[in-house]
Amino acid sequence: MSLFELILLAPVDEIETLSEALDALDALSVSVEDADAQTPAEQALFGEPGMPPPKAGWERSRVVSLFASEALARDAASVLTAQDFFAGCQLVAIQAVPEQDWVRLTQSQFTPVEITPEFWIVPTWHEPPEQAKQLIRLDPGLAFGTGTHPTTRMCLRWIAGQGAANKPLARVLDYGCGSGILAIGAAKFGAVDIDAVDIDEAAVESTRANAEANHVTLNAGLPDKAVGAYQTVLANILATPLKVLAPLLCSHVQKGGSLVLAGILERQADELKAAYQPYCQLQVLDQEEGWILMGARF
């Protein structure tokens, strides 16, 4: 069955009402995206302790809905773009969605990712490269972290570098663990006491499943699971929550330990240094595709 996609632009204050209207107009699904994604105007939406609740959408939101027929999609567009209905709603496109073997398509988009020549992230449906002496088996899922993003790769390179330098990671905290990829990487390179925490329970479950699939032992839970001091604290989130979390994250680093932060754009380096200055001296450890890895020794 061919489906049709209706794409609209809408301001943030109309997102919830627009989504309800689409549902009433027989939309099969509705998703909301940042209309400025992959541009300098891109906005991050997140929720962390101590921060206001995230908005329902972006200032300029792209609302994508699926319909069972072109006629239904066009009828919905006519209603929603009428001047007396949603003043800020703009029609972008109505288009057929090609029929796909979604499993095969997804698998084709995720291939082994090289972290170092000997350390790879490999989906379960792929054979590992011959040169891979260390690997993480990981399939794409609901939680962030498959190794394809520069921030994840930089964190994993740092972890691998500690292993190569015979610097055991010992007790590790992965704050904002997502898929658990950093915690699993730490286990692969010698960490023996690992706490992986996230505010999203789906991420916690994903971390547990991925740890089991990789035959590593760790403790996954909500943020209150993080207790005491750690030799290594890893946080791959985004710059704004990293600034808010500065006192908390630094309080978990033991004397002589390391703090490693990612999810930071190059232009945000000075902001992070200022936020962490009362606790430590952040330095840029790595950079890739406009993103940087920052860290400090305590």
Swiss-Prot record:
Protein name: Ribosomal protein L11 methyltransferase
UniProt-annotated location(s): Cytoplasm
GO CC, any one term: cytosol
Cross-referenced PANTHER family: ELECTRON TRANSFER FLAVOPROTEIN BETA SUBUNIT LYSINE METHYLTRANSFERASE
A Pfam cross-reference name: PrmA
Role this protein plays: Methylates ribosomal protein L11.
Keyword S-adenosyl-L-methionine (UniProt): yes
